[in-house]
From Swiss-Prot:
Gene source species: Rattus norvegicus
UniProt record, GO biological process: actin crosslink formation; atrial cardiac muscle tissue morphogenesis; cardiac muscle contraction; heart development; muscle contraction; muscle filament sliding; negative regulation of ATP-dependent activity; positive regulation of ATP-dependent activity
Keywords linked to the UniProt accession: Acetylation, Muscle protein, Phosphoprotein
Protein role: Troponin T is the tropomyosin-binding subunit of troponin, the thin filament regulatory complex which confers calcium-sensitivity to striated muscle actomyosin ATPase activity.
Protein name in the entry: Troponin T, cardiac muscle
Region ranges (Disordered): 1-97, 137-220
Gene: Tnnt2
Amino acid sequence: MSDAEEEVVEYEEEQEEEDWSEEEEDEQEEAVEEEDGEAEPDPEGEAEAEEDKAEEVGPDEEARDAEDGPVEDSKPKPSRLFMPNLVPPKIPDGERVDFDDIHRKRMEKDLNELQTLIEAHFENRKKEEEELISLKDRIEKRRAERAEQQRIRNEREKERQNRLAEERARREEEENRRKAEDEARKKKALSNMMHFGGYIQKAQTERKSGKRQTEREKKKKILAERRKVLAIDHLNEDQLREKAKELWQSIHNLEAEKFDLQEKFKQQKYEINVLRNRINDNQKVSKTRGKAKVTGRWK
């Protein structure tokens, strides 16, 4: 029911209540008028009532009254108690109130309010169900995202472990190769020491002949001995790969020797500095001891 219809129904109810109140006031006024009409004494009726009373009394009473003498007329007689008749209120025959219509309108109003509440309840329930469905969807989506993130994290961890394993294997391989190279160098050094006498003899002969080589000539000679002619025109693809691996291995060995020599040079330099500092400290101590002895002697 709309607000306009509710206002119309309320206005009709107020009008009906006003009509009822006016009718009740009219009925009360009519009842008061009837009571006033019954309260007024009718002289003719009183006279007839007195006559009937006198007839009922009889001659004996008249004789008794005659003996007693005349009664004083001026004495007031007690009045009868008046009980008004209660008249039920009458419903006027004019415009009658349709209680069925009022009840029906009230029922329709209650029914409309109940229908509105039911619709609001179902709308709220529908919204709650939609929110619950959306919440479940978000939970499932978040769960899938977490599973994907966990899978990516596991893959990255697996790749990292593989890289660490490969790096560890590569280091072990390099360490083994370095040890093998060290053993080879040691063996080569021992073999060179065996032929050291030939080198000494060759140097003595060169010294005797008076021919002295400069450092640049020595360097060129050493490089010429080490550097070989690269003949790769007659090699196929596999042989070229093997040759490239061999050259790379030789470069790697040279770099390793260079690194070892640099570390050895640093160590020797450090030892020289340590020895020099020790010598300087010993010299200072010896000088102070000598001065102390001289001063003590002169005292």
